[in-house]
Curated annotation (Swiss-Prot):
Swiss-Prot/TrEMBL keywords: Aspartyl protease, Glycoprotein, Hydrolase, Protease
Protein name as annotated: Pregnancy-associated glycoprotein 67
Entry PTM: Glycosylated.
This protein's record includes keyword Protease: yes
Entry's Gene Ontology BP terms: proteolysis
Tissue localization of expression: Placenta.
EC identifiers of the protein: 3.4.23.-
GO MF entry, a single one: aspartic-type endopeptidase activity
Family the UniProt entry places it in: Belongs to the peptidase A1 family.
Length: 25
């Protein structure tokens, strides 16, 4: 999943935010 960060940074960030929202909510 490391190379995905360089290939699709926006997608990775969106996934991170999504997971964060699930953890908080």
């Amino acid at each position: 999943r490391g190379s995905x960060l360089t290939t699709h940074p926006l997608r990775n960030i969106k996934d991170l935010v999504y997971m964060g929202x699930i953890t908080i909510g």
